[in-house]
C-alpha cells in the first residue's frame, strides 16, 4: 500500500509521524498487555482513551477509562492486541481540514469544518467553521501541507484536530474523502469528490 495508507491504518505509525513533524498529539503509550495498560494509565492519569492501534473507526475499538479500576474491563473489551492509551483531551471543539495535492505539488486546501459527534459518530459538520483565529487557521494549513509533503501524498487527505486552550492537537488523519467534507458537494465549485 501507499505510505499514506500504511501510516493511517496504524495509530502507532500515525502518532510517530505527527511527532516527527512537530504536530502536537495527546500524551500516549503503546501497550500490549493488561499489565502495560495499567502502567500506562497510572503514568498518564485518568481519564484516558484506549484505542486499538488498527481497525478502529467511529468510536469502535475505543474505551474511555475514568478510573484505574476499569483497566481489566477495558482490556477484556478491546484488548488482547496492541493498544494506544492517550491522555484525555479537554477540547473546545473538533475541527477537520481537507487538502488535495497533485503530483506537480499543486495543492488546494478547503476551509476548516467544525464537527459535532454523538456516541462517536459524526452527526454534522459546519463549514466553514466559525470564529477561527488566523493563528489556528495558519497552524492547521501548515500541518496538512507538511503531512502531504512528508507522505508524498497525491490525492485527498483529511486531518482531524482538537482545538484546545493551547492551540491544536492532532487526533487522526484519513487519506480519502471524508464525511466532514460532504458539504463541499453543494458548497464549492469543486467538491472533495
Annotated model-derived regions:
Residues 191-193:
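Internal helical hairpin/lid segments
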Residues 174-189:
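Glycine-rich phosphate/pyrophosphate-binding beta-alpha loops
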Residues 44-45, 164-169:
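A short, glycine/Asx- and small/polar-enriched loop/turn
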Residues 65-159, 163-165:
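Internal nucleotide-binding/catalytic subdomain
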Residues 1-44, 55-56:
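Conserved N-proximal alpha/beta basic substrate-recognition cap immediately N-terminal to
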Amino acid at each position: 500500500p501507499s505510505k499514506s495508507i500504511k501510516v493511517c491504518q496504524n495509530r502507532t505509525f500515525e502518532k510517530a509521524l505527527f511527532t516527527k513533524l512537530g504536530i502536537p498529539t495527546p500524551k500516549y503509550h503503546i501497550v500490549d498487555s493488561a499489565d502495560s495498560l495499567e502502567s500506562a494509565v497510572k503514568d498518564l492519569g485518568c481519564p484516558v482513551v484506549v484505542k486499538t492501534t488498527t481497525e478502529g473507526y467511529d468510536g469502535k475499538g475505543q474505551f474511555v477509562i475514568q478510573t484505574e479500576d476499569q483497566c481489566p474491563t477495558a482490556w477484556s473489551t478491546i484488548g488482547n492486541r496492541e493498544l494506544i492509551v492517550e491522555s484525555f483531551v479537554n477540547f473546545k471543539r473538533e475541527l477537520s481540514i481537507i487538502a488535495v495535492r497533485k503530483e506537480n505539488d499543486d495543492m488546494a486546501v478547503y476551509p476548516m469544518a467544525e464537527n459535532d459527534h454523538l456516541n462517536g459518530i459524526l452527526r454534522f459538520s459546519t463549514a466553514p467553521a466559525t470564529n477561527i483565529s488566523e493563528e489556528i487557521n495558519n497552524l492547521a494549513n501548515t500541518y496538512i501541507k507538511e503531512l502531504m509533503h512528508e507522505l508524498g501524498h497525491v490525492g485527498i487527505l483529511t486531518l482531524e484536530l482538537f482545538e484546545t486552550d493551547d492551540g491544536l492537537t492532532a487526533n487522526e488523519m484519513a487519506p480519502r474523502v471524508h464525511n466532514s467534507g460532504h458539504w463541499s458537494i453543494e458548497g464549492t465549485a469543486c467538491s472533495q469528490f
